[in-house]
């Protein structure tokens, strides 16, 4: 059996250095990275979908969670704490995977709690629209040769506008304002799906698959939530 050359071994080691991007790695490394990212993402959404379905379709769970605001806040702040921990320890294996599991569970509980306040049909519509948008945007970005890194500054500026507008929206209860903010938010996170899909190939290293999956997971969750609110407000008009 032939042994790999020293130059081949060296190039593989270089591929895994955090300073090199996935795009500069070998085809084998790139494909392995993508399998890890989207494999983790699929597992995250299986857990999230299953948790949401239990809370949505079982009246006892729906009633319990709607009467337990402390639990909703605990899962929300738990998600925030775990995402900060993941950011700090994203290179520490297997700690990053344990934190990823904890974050996904906490975020699933948070999302499941939110959807209990919406009609089942609206939730299903938002789910289907989110899935279709994610698949279309991912396919487009991975096949495109355009440089989407230029979107970054504009998207982060739009995100801050969205956050500040959302805070103002708490005090201004207007259906038209909610509709506009929901549509704007959905567009912003469609942009983030394109940006983060491009970034996972051109900015992240082959060992940062946990960070890549978290970025995409959060993009999809936020897109879903904005579409959910958009559909809810639209149905009231």
Swiss-Prot record:
<dbReference type="Pfam" id="PF01027">
    <property type="entry name" value="Bax1-I"/>
</dbReference>
<feature type="topological domain" description="Cytoplasmic">
    <location>
        <begin position="138"/>
        <end position="151"/>
    </location>
</feature>
<feature type="topological domain" description="Cytoplasmic">
    <location>
        <begin position="1"/>
        <end position="37"/>
    </location>
</feature>
<dbReference type="InterPro" id="IPR006214">
    <property type="entry name" value="Bax_inhibitor_1-related"/>
</dbReference>
<feature type="topological domain" description="Lumenal">
    <location>
        <begin position="173"/>
        <end position="174"/>
    </location>
</feature>
<feature type="transmembrane region" description="Helical">
    <location>
        <begin position="38"/>
        <end position="58"/>
    </location>
</feature>
<dbReference type="GO" id="GO:0043066">
    <property type="term" value="P:negative regulation of apoptotic process"/>
</dbReference>
<keyword id="KW-0812">Transmembrane</keyword>
<feature type="topological domain" description="Lumenal">
    <location>
        <begin position="59"/>
        <end position="67"/>
    </location>
</feature>
<feature type="topological domain" description="Cytoplasmic">
    <location>
        <begin position="89"/>
        <end position="94"/>
    </location>
</feature>
<feature type="topological domain" description="Cytoplasmic">
    <location>
        <begin position="231"/>
        <end position="237"/>
    </location>
</feature>
<feature type="topological domain" description="Lumenal">
    <location>
        <position position="116"/>
    </location>
</feature>
<feature type="intramembrane region" description="Helical">
    <location>
        <begin position="210"/>
        <end position="230"/>
    </location>
</feature>
<feature type="topological domain" description="Cytoplasmic">
    <location>
        <begin position="196"/>
        <end position="209"/>
    </location>
</feature>
<protein>
    <recommendedName>
        <fullName>Golgi anti-apoptotic protein</fullName>
    </recommendedName>
</protein>
<keyword id="KW-1133">Transmembrane helix</keyword>
<dbReference type="GO" id="GO:0016020">
    <property type="term" value="C:membrane"/>
</dbReference>
<keyword id="KW-0053">Apoptosis</keyword>
<feature type="transmembrane region" description="Helical">
    <location>
        <begin position="117"/>
        <end position="137"/>
    </location>
</feature>
<feature type="transmembrane region" description="Helical">
    <location>
        <begin position="68"/>
        <end position="88"/>
    </location>
</feature>
<feature type="transmembrane region" description="Helical">
    <location>
        <begin position="152"/>
        <end position="172"/>
    </location>
</feature>
<feature type="transmembrane region" description="Helical">
    <location>
        <begin position="95"/>
        <end position="115"/>
    </location>
</feature>
<dbReference type="GO" id="GO:0044178">
    <property type="term" value="C:host cell Golgi membrane"/>
</dbReference>
<comment type="similarity">
    <text>Belongs to the BI1 family. LFG subfamily.</text>
</comment>
<keyword id="KW-0472">Membrane</keyword>
<keyword id="KW-1040">Host Golgi apparatus</keyword>
<feature type="transmembrane region" description="Helical">
    <location>
        <begin position="175"/>
        <end position="195"/>
    </location>
</feature>
<keyword id="KW-1043">Host membrane</keyword>
<comment type="function">
    <text>May affect virulence through inhibition of apoptosis.</text>
</comment>
């Amino acid at each position: 059996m032939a042994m790999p050359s020293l130059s081949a071994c060296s190039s593989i080691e270089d591929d895994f250095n955090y300073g090199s991007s996935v795009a500069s790695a070998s085809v084998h490394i790139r494909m392995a990275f993508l399998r890890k990212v989207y494999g983790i993402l699929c597992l995250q959404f299986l857990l999230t979908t299953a948790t949401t379905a239990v809370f949505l379709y079982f009246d006892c769970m729906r009633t319990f969670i709607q009467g337990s605001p402390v639990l909703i806040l605990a899962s929300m702040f738990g998600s925030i704490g775990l995402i900060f921990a993941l950011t700090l320890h994203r290179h520490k294996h297997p700690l990053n995977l344990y934190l990823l599991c904890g974050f996904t569970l906490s975020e699933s509980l948070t999302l499941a709690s939110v959807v209990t306040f919406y009609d089942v049909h609206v939730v299903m519509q938002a789910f289907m629209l989110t899935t279709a948008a994610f698949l279309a945007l991912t396919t487009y970005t991975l096949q495109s040769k355009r440089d989407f890194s230029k979107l970054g500054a504009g998207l982060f500026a739009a995100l801050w506008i969205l956050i500040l507008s959302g805070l103002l929206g708490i005090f201004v209860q207007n259906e038209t304002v909610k509709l506009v903010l929901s549509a704007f938010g959905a567009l912003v996170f469609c942009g983030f799906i394109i940006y983060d899909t491009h970034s996972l190939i051109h900015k992240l290293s082959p060992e940062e698959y946990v960070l890549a999956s978290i970025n995409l997971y959060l993009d999809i969750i936020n897109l879903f939530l904005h579409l959910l609110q958009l559909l809810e407000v639209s149905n009231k008009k």
